[in-house]
Amino acid sequence: MVDSTHSPEVERGIAALNELLGKEAAALLSPEKTRKDEVACFSFPIPADYTGTPRTLRIAFPRNFPLASLRLNVEPSPWLEWPHAMKSGLCLHGFREKPITGTPETVVHDSFSRFGTILNFVVEGSDRAMRDAEFHREITSYWNTQLGVSPQDLLLLERPKSGSELYATSDPRPSRRNQTAWLATSIESLRVHFRRIAGLSAKIRSPAVPGFYVKLQTFPGVRIPVADRLIDWLTPHLSPDDCKKFLAWFSGHGSLANRWIVLELPGPAGSPVYCLDVRSYSKQPDHGRWYGFRTARRWSGKNQPNHVPVLVRGAIINILDRNDILSRDLSGTAVELEKARVVMIGVGSLGSTIAQQLARSGIGEIVLIDPDMLESANLGRHVLGADDLGKWKAIALAEKITRDLPTVKAIPYVDYAEMLLISKPGLFENADLVIVTTADWSSEVALWRKKSAGTRWGLLQAWSEPHTLVGHTLLAPAGEFDARHLFDDSGNFNFRFTEWPKGDGVIAIPACGQSFIPGGASGMANVASMVVQTALRSLTAQLNEQAWISTIYRPQDAAARGGVYKGPLLEKGVQHIVLEREWPTPEGGDA
């Protein structure tokens, strides 16, 4: 059955297919007409499935086989009857899986191995519970293939604990007015989010209630019903209490053109959600609805008809819930950090990067202290951008963190740390960790003076050496600690790893007493990452003792930039290393 007109790879694939099936089964292969980009095709009868429907497996070798995988299709299509069967054919690979590459024999064997797994779920006499469980693992994919896509996406401002009505307002930004709707269980949540996004207070008096959030107790069927049968399809899978509330909401808001049903899939709290856009009145294309602050006054529900659904679509929904935002971090660190409070002194190029990473790690509250404005020269290595030029760094960064991560409380202060230690001591007394990255000796001295008297908060001082090839962190846990003896009277670290005899370490600028330490964004990222990891270990009680931590990246580059490296030698082939040890001794070496 090998055609010599085929490429050697296809011939090997066909031979592998015959060998895999065996002599008797291979005799059942029937040549079929090829389709676009196919060079060989066969049909093969397969055992009856649980529906009793006779089907045939279509096996096609694509033109660029084995770089392209074998094409397997079942006819007639078992879409919504077999797991992993789509309209276009069988889906042999799961989420983010790719077809393997290899020899023709390997590709044929892999494809049939995966097909055999699917067949085991559906052959006559197969276990229905196992088949249903396989459907449920990818249930939203099957629903998506049956539903159109709503023109409006949704932002759920928090995840409800139980079945709840959802108030709605539209995103006020012009580009999103009819594109995105905000949903929340309370009007106050909508007000807070509006203030966060628009920077204004909103008088949201009577918003529409077009949404309902409900937890599924069991899975509905994989096949979506016609629109007017949707409620019958859904309600058997709700708890009695949720079902009662849901039906009251659905009938009470039947005059709305669009209703949103947010389904939390069965499973533990925080399970994935799926949203249905239920449209009444018309199946005609629409462009999304505007939900204002008093929309509900237009739809009181009194003396208005309850329109049955005529169209059901899937809708994209995102959730601004802390657990959802941090769900990809499975280490458990975020749970421990929820109540952590960090005071960040200095939010320049290093401090801003640290603050942003801490916020994304799950810190509950972060206080940002910095007296400076953002300038154009800062943009190359700061997390803020051109729109923030001329703004106070602390305020602009707090706004960015709050806008990007609404579950984090960011509080800005445009002031000097040494002044706030006197005027607002509670800022520090209530902190778990204070991080200073100012490279300003006066603020560092003030903090170490306070720390030497004993504090409940830990202190982490971090800085980079010129050109960001080297960075350091000194960590002092709760208690009495003082690191002032490790620096000279000007605040220079006595145990630095680089020297800059040509004066290239600190660059003066034409202003009274002002200068900057040179370095790029990539080098600063190395230092920031080291500081963040140290801070997280301290906050989660993994590091409860004083430590000196250094990051070193390509120290040989110092010579090309006018410097001399005198720190620890790196082994051949090592480009980047992080060292951790006790504080250095005053005599000039590690403890």
Regions found by a protein language model. Give the residues of each.
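N-terminal charged helix/coil linker that caps or initiates catalytic domains
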Residues: 282-342
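Glycine-rich phosphate/adenylate-binding loop
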Residues: 144-303, 429-433, 437-591
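S-adenosyl-L-methionine
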Residues: 404-423
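Glycine-rich phosphate-binding loop and adjoining beta1-alpha1-beta2 segment
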Residues: 371-406
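A short, aliphatic-rich alpha-helical micro-motif
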Residues: 337, 427-429
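Glycine-rich adenosine-cofactor-binding loop
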Residues: 333-373
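Compact alpha/beta protein-protein interaction domains typified by the UBC
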Residues: 30-97, 105-109
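Domain-level detector for trafficking modules
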Residues: 84-143
